[in-house]
Amino acid sequence: MSWLSRLNPRGPGTRTGRHAAPSSPCTADPETCLMVFENHWRQVSGVLKQRESSVGGFADDLTAVRNHTDQMLCLLAEERPAGGDIDSPAMGPILEMVVAENILEELVQWHVCRGLDPDSQLELLKLFEMLIGQSHQPLLLHSAVLQPLLSLLGACVDPQMGCPPALESSLVLLLNQVCVSMAKETAVLELLFRCGSVQQGPTNLLIFSLLVPFIHRDGALGQQARDALLLVMATSASNHAVARHITENSYFCPVLATGLSGLYSSLPRKIEVRGDDWHALRREDWIGVSSLVLFMNSLEFCNAVVQVAHPLVRCQLLDYLHNGFLVPVMGPALHKSSVDEMIASTAYLDLFLRCITETSLLKTFLRFILLHHHDNDTILDTLLTRISSNSRLCMVSLSLFKTLLSLNCEDLMLQLVLRYLLPCTHVMLSQRRAVRETDLYGKSADKFLSLIPECCRITSAPSGERDEEPAFWGKVLGSPTSESPVHPRPSTPSRLALFIRQQSSGGQANPSSSGSENAPSSPRGSVSSPLSPDSPMHQLSDFSEGETGYLEYLRDARKGIELCSWGCRDWSAPYDGENPSPNSAPLPPPPPTSNPSLSMVQEHFSVMDPTQQRAAVVAAARAEWSSSDRDSGEWDVTISKNCISLTPRSKKRSLLPSSIPLQSSSSASVSTEITGASETVYQHSRSTPHPALYNGMGQVEFTDSVDERMEAKKVKRDSDVNSGMVETGMNGSMGPVDYNDFHVGSTLKSSQVQLKPHLQHHTSVPSSTQECLPTESHRLSPVLGLTESSAASRGSESVERLIEELLERAPSEPLSGDSKCQGISIEAFHQELRELEERVRERRVSSRSSEESSRESRTAPLPSLTDEDCLPVETEQRSSETKPDSSTTGVFSPARPLGQPLAQPYTGPFITVLFSKLENMMQNSLYVNILLTGVVFQLACYPQPLLRSFLLNANMVFQPSVKSLIQVLGTVKNRIEVFAAAHEDFPAMLRKARRFLVARGKLDWSDSAMGVPSLRRSDSLIKSRKPSLGDLILRHTNSPTRARHAAQLALAHVRDGGQSLHSALFRGSAASGASGLEKQAEALRVKNAVYCAVIFSEFLKELAALAQEHAVALPFPPSQGTEE
């Protein structure tokens, strides 16, 4: 039979491996193949009929049956259809014989009756896998093939023990082939469902049930099982009966969700990295950690199932993921007490959100973040607290928020920012129309660029400095093209290729080169770096680091705005100050008084007792300020439970006219540290000799004198004005103090009473309304709550002492700082405070119903008063708003639960924390500032006029208690200039910092011999390399070789971790006579300040570019079908 060798050239007793390629098409005619098949079957059937009389020789019979069966199934697999229609071809003659005589059923039953040993099971599984995988005919459409297959599968899998380990790979491969065949022929699914019900009962779809246990397996086995299940999901997407079976009679969704929980518990609980710029898990970070790879594979499978599955399956899976994984596992993980575990869980959540692509699954994660409460706090509130934490946790949290902002989710943005801006209380009533205005003339951009500190506008380096420059600062090869801009391109990267957020398109920049060596810098001359290697990044420094490629920033801004606008095109409202209407927009709901975590009590601020908290605050303050200039200023952000308290320490000027003279140096700025745990307050540091007043909650429960709780910090004052200026910090602005406006509020918690003295002022007061000044343009405040007698007594003493000290130190003449306040006398002020004291005493004996009415009054919309509203004051509380003196300490709006509607304008905890971090840029590390400015950049890309005008419109007039981004940046500018004036070598340090950042951006970290070692997994995730700031600092792999080599040499000391970043750039800047610890602290402070100057200048140019691009951006039309 020479034809048989041509047909199947295999020796007796041997078989082609299951991974072998299919044999060549049959060279024999169908009739010959059928004759051979019949011959093999006659020999096999003879053995099968003798099975009952046979006593011995079972091994010989088994061998003969295997050999003949092998030949038969190979002939069947290589047979082609006999012809007929393309859609329904006729069966070949061999297949007709198999179906007519039920050959496969007899073979399987003979093996089952003889007893299926593992070897027999394995051989049969391989034979069926070969038959189904290589057949040219749809075999599974015939019950004569499908029924024996199901019988074999049922016999191979023990109901109690499951599949034997030796059979797992063959079983999964066979099931995968069945699912592939099912995907090609959807009718196979119906047959499987019907045959499975008959064979295994109505509660078991055998193919599906056998695959479920392998969902979370690692390696190729698990991947094949997931691929097969995904094919089942896709095929059953339109089959309601199968979908019902999966949801009602299988454990697919529970196994998938709870399996994720089990896999998450095996993830490393600590992420150890050597680089100080690490902030997010990238693929190269986790690809070597088996437990994380396994989890990510399962999560990606969930994402795929949600994408293709039937709606019934999708809904059940999402519900199980929320209630079986996110709530019981991710929730507690995000609230671990260990900082390392918080960092890991936050990084994991960020990674999950970046890997998920399906909208429904993203919604489930966002629902968990926005709505789920853990220990009475939402996950979002918890994550907000992390921004003000230590550097590493802050960086990971900022990275997470950048990921959240990139989702362009309306619900998320409403919760984070828009709900606080919707009532438009942050702008003056007459300015609401300006929310929708477009800045066509670039005034806002000009304002941002004007904030670049003069000390950062370096046009040339001294010759001594140039000699130290490495060779790669030479000009880029080639001459300028005809498209080169008139002014030179920059020599430091755009949005610093240095620091740009997730930009990997380094080669997309305009390749035009720079201009002449001595080209003049632009009017806004500042420094940046180009985005691409062929930009003037490599130019010689003799043309200076003078002017950044502003066009690069414009391109980045346009891209960011377009992506964001596209993502927001189906939002329910434009958020333009009119839709939704500010009058009908719901204010954030008040916290339930029954929830202890939402009431203004000690537990909001700390779990420590007053003594412990004071000790902790003082210790933290001393440790923090030991390495920095105490006069440089900082906001102490304390976020606990649902309250965010920001205690300003700043004494630098904010961005306000400098023509207002300051007070003499004998004045002191007072920063208060309250003893009680609940006494974290927003405080006024006064430039006048008045005691500190709280624009938040002043505590009634004082047990020591006020003087014992104050730390006086002296600052320079000018001596020609005694104007009593007060700086309101994050949500404040500048103006003279109006001592006629003062109100005290209280809230009740058990026997504890807390007062809320507010001292605020407006920018101007019309002289025609001086008599009714206390009521003009003021927001009505909540009435006082009830108190118990003991607490009321303490409250009375506190109020009386506060009033007496205020009266003793108040000026006896009208304030000289404001010509419009000349009609105000100290007698009127005295009288009003006495009336206020009487009202406080009357409220102590009011009934319980008065307390309930006060709560209702807090939730009611608060009217904006006009000039005609100047009537006698009949409310229990009033507030006046003051503009800050730029030399005094900033004060925030009152500490309050997250989401509480306010009597005073409040821009929300997210904006508050971001602005506080921004104002504290001088103390932040380089990488914190990079991530922080990246988040603000992402926020400013949103096209909604409410948000755009709040961040980028420098011409908007906000309420005096609301501090704008321009003011925050102005404060940073002043601090940088003060720092630069105090350090003669600042220009040299600035150039070195820029050079380092450019070199770092150009370095390909995988080039050197100190390559990236593989990740190791012990009990923690160890990343033994210094990453490139997670794509924020670009890797220019196509940079010239000599440039890369020079960069590697410049950073070799950083790569091995032996020296700090500062030691290479700022050697010798610390005081030589200081101790080692003091030198390190001073070096850290100097390093942060110099890098802050570089980041700050580039950030201003980014904001200017955003402001210009918003003016010309066009909205995208809504899509035809809104996504889920």
UniProtKB/Swiss-Prot annotation:
Sequence ranges of Low complexity compositional bias: 509-532
BP GO terms, sorted: early endosome to late endosome transport; endosome organization; endosome to lysosome transport; lysosome organization; protein localization to perinuclear region of cytoplasm; protein transport
Alphabetized InterPro entries for the sequence: FHIP, FHIP_C, FHIP_KELAA_motif
Lineage: Eukaryota, Metazoa, Chordata, Craniata, Vertebrata
Subunit structure: Component of the FTS/Hook/FHIP complex (FHF complex), composed of AKTIP/FTS, FHIP1B, and one or more members of the Hook family of proteins HOOK1, HOOK2, and HOOK3. The FHF complex associates with the homotypic vesicular sorting complex (the HOPS complex).
Annotated spans, Disordered: 1-25, 461-542, 577-599, 713-732, 838-900
Known function: Component of the FTS/Hook/FHIP complex (FHF complex). The FHF complex may function to promote vesicle trafficking and/or fusion via the homotypic vesicular protein sorting complex (the HOPS complex). FHF complex promotes the distribution of AP-4 complex to the perinuclear area of the cell.
Name of this protein: FHF complex subunit HOOK-interacting protein 1B
Organism from which the protein derives: Danio rerio
Ranges of compositional bias, category Basic and acidic residues: 838-858, 875-884
Start-end of Pro residues biased regions: 583-594
